[in-house]
């Protein structure tokens, strides 16, 4: 993309799109957004599920290509009838790897669909020519070359990731989740992004209700300033140190 887009721009676009979709489909009380319905019925983009077989050699072998947004020109390697074939999909077709149809992969599938929709929205927003794009999943345990890190953290990918999170978890929905699961209070967090088991369970419950991964829910809480940082002493007292021990700050001369 030829210009920088602010997070506020992406947030506003995502919120406006989802608000219109929610009102159109009467989904005001739903926690789990129908992202496939949003993409196919609202944006008008077809979704295909195929076994993506793009070669991943050398520096790319650690990344798995899970999704693809077609520009109508770039060929995609997929497995059809047991044979790897190059297919040119119609422009703006989203192709998702079949492995994500596994029920256990629902959160990843939904994020991948939203990510490719994010690319489409950003292209429209910036009035750019369509460009084919892949969604690669970052593996925190892998060692990436500088070139692969650049691809993974490419500006366009960051925009699409932010847009995906906004579509799956718009601000209004996040507010409803907080009201329903945490009595409207911000989620407690400690320095260094440390979470107590209670808050980890809370995030999992909200993520399950919204049909997203824990990581996506966590990032949205952070992006929307829905965390409240508490002192590390509180965490140590509650989760690490033995009860009944006298701590230095409790002594009258400290």
Model region roles, listed by residue range:
Residues 1-254:
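Active-site hotspot residues in diverse enzymes, especially metal/ion-binding acidic/histidine motifs
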């Amino acid at each position: 993309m030829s210009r920088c887009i602010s997070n506020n721009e992406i947030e506003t676009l995502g919120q406006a799109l989802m608000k219109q979709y929610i009102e159109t489909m009467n989904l005001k009380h739903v926690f789990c957004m129908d992202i496939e319905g949003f993409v196919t019925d609202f944006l008008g983009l077809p979704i295909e599920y195929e076994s993506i077989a793009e070669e991943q050699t050398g520096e790319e072998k650690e990344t798995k290509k899970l999704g693809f947004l077609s520009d109508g020109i770039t060929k995609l390697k997929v497995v059809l009838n047991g044979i790897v074939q190059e297919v040119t999909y119609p422009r703006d077709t989203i192709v998702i790897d079949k492995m994500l149809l596994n029920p256990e992969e629902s959160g990843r599938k939904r994020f991948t669909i939203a990510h490719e929709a994010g690319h489409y929205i950003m292209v429209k927003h910036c009035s750019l020519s369509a460009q084919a794009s892949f969604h690669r999943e970052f593996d925190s345990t892998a060692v990436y070359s500088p070139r692969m890190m650049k691809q993974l953290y490419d500006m366009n990918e960051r925009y699409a990731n932010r847009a995906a999170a906004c579509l799956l978890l718009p601000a209004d929905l996040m507010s409803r989740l907080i009201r329903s699961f945490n009595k409207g209070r911000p989620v407690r967090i400690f320095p260094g992004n440390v979470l107590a088991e209670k808050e980890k369970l809370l995030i999992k419950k909200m993520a399950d209700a919204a049909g997203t991964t824990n990581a996506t829910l966590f990032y949205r809480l952070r992006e929307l300033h829905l965390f409240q940082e508490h002192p590390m002493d509180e965490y140590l007292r509650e989760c690490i140190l033995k009860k009944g021990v006298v701590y230095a700050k409790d002594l009258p001369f400290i």
